[in-house]
């Protein structure tokens, strides 16, 4: 067997009969050296020619398109009486059209090159490159080790505008290693189907999430001893939503001139007080004097944020939240009363933020940004399974903002 085909294409068990070159291609005609029964290994067999195969191999120098041609035989073994197709050692499966060596090169290039670029470089179909990577990822992430997992984060991300079940993905990640544990279609309890089997053998102690009742009830049902942490980002976001609702409610009672003025101050109310310029602080002070509900909501928003800044332990945080809720319930602002009820209902999960050393869902939010960037770079994913497999791989690859 010629040495060049062994070291460049990893061809074993075949002898080179002839070769043909053009300006950009090379074709090698191969012949099997010795046939053996794939079941018992006997050489007492009858080989019947079945079909002619042409397989793409790795480029050689200026020959960008390399083909290896050979005849596939059907084998009959006199020893074990078995009938089989002969095994081709340099193919990953019997119907493969490219060699194992070329497959490995393509998968290595996918770390820094797009599917389209690789397809153009090797003169292969885009679909063939995608299916090769999809098969590799499916095999790699078919089983995920979860025995070591102690802390996970659960979050959903909006990924499209299709059917109701296709608009969202629910993602579970190991907060210590960053590995993706589960990717489910949609949001809510239905999206967590399959996650229970994966997490059953884990050493789960803590789960971070937003304040959605669906995730909370699912964890409470299947992992009753696990501590739940409601991410502080979502608590502040919920308060900002209440504040914005007060602003819009107040605007509805104004004339058009006042509405225009207050509409432009939306983000002034949502910003932290210390981040506001002096002129914005003066405008805000005047607005709070003119509209009491809006002023009260802003003050309670800042007070809630200060709890996260100043409280040192879960004990102090619990006292501060109880006081905040008591004062909010004494106001005449319905949005503040609703927020107070929510905090009282979720208080154990909220103060767990201090119990577990300020653990949060921030890594999940950052990971969602990487998913959006991945989607934008690919101009969307038509293959849902391929998209989910790429999410499993995402912690291992770097996403750049350039295409």
Language-model region placement:
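Short, conserved DNA-binding cores of transcription-related domains
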Residues: 1-88
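Short, conserved catalytic/metal-binding motifs centered on acidic residues
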Residues: 28, 77, 118, 152-157, ...
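Short, positively charged, Gly/Tyr-enriched micro-motifs
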Residues: 55-152, 156-163, 202-205, 356
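Acidic, glycine-enriched active-site microenvironments
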Residues: 94-104, 116, 176, 182, ...
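Basic, amphipathic alpha-helical segments enriched in Lys/Arg and hydrophobic/aromatic residues
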Residues: 121, 325-403
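RNase H-like nuclease fold core
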Residues: 134-218
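Conserved beta-strand -> loop -> alpha-helix junction used to position metal-binding or nucleic-acid-contacting
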Residues: 210-213, 220-259, 264, 365
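Helix-loop elements that line ligand-binding/catalytic pockets
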Residues: 265-332
């Amino acid at each position: 067997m010629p040495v060049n085909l062994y070291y460049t294409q990893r061809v074993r068990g075949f002898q080179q009969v002839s070769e043909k070159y053009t300006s950009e291609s090379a074709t090698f005609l191969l012949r099997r050296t010795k046939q053996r029964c794939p079941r018992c290994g006997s050489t007492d067999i009858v080989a019947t020619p079945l079909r002619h195969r042409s397989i793409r191999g790795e480029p050689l120098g200026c020959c960008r398109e390399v083909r290896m041609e050979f005849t596939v035989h059907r084998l009959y073994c006199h020893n074990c009486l078995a009938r089989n197709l002969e095994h081709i050692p340099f193919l990953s499966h019997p119907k493969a059209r490219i060699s194992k060596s070329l497959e490995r090169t393509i998968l290595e290039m996918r770390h820094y090159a797009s599917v389209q670029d690789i397809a153009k470089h090797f003169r292969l179909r885009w679909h063939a490159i995608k299916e090769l990577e999809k098969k590799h990822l499916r095999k790699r992430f078919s089983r995920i080790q979860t025995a070591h997992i102690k802390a996970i984060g659960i979050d959903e991300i909006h990924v499209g505008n299709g059917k109701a079940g296709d608009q969202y993905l629910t993602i579970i990640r190991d907060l210590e290693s960053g590995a993706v544990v589960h990717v489910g279609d949609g949001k809510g309890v239905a999206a967590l189907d399959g996650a229970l089997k994966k997490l059953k053998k884990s050493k789960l102690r803590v789960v971070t999430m937003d304040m959605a009742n669906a995730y909370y009830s699912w964890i409470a049902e299947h992992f009753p001893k696990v501590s739940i942490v409601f991410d502080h980002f979502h608590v502040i976001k919920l308060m900002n939503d209440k504040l914005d609702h007060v602003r819009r409610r107040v605007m509805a009672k104004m004339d058009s001139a006042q509405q225009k003025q207050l509409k432009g101050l939306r983000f002034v109310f949502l910003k932290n007080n210390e981040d506001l310029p002096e002129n914005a602080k003066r405008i805000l002070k005047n607005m709070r004097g003119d509209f009491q509900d809006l002023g009260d909501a802003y003050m309670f928003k800042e007070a809630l944020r200060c709890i996260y800044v100043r409280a040192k332990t879960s004990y102090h945080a619990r006292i501060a939240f109880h006081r905040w809720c008591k004062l909010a319930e004494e106001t005449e602002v319905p949005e503040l009363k609703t927020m107070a009820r929510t905090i009282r209902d979720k208080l154990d999960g909220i103060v767990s933020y201090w119990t577990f050393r300020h653990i949060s869902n921030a890594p999940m939010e950052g990971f969602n940004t990487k998913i959006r960037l991945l989607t934008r770079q690919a101009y969307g994913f038509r293959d849902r399974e391929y998209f989910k497999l790429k999410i499993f791989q995402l912690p291992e690859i770097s996403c750049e903002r350039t295409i």
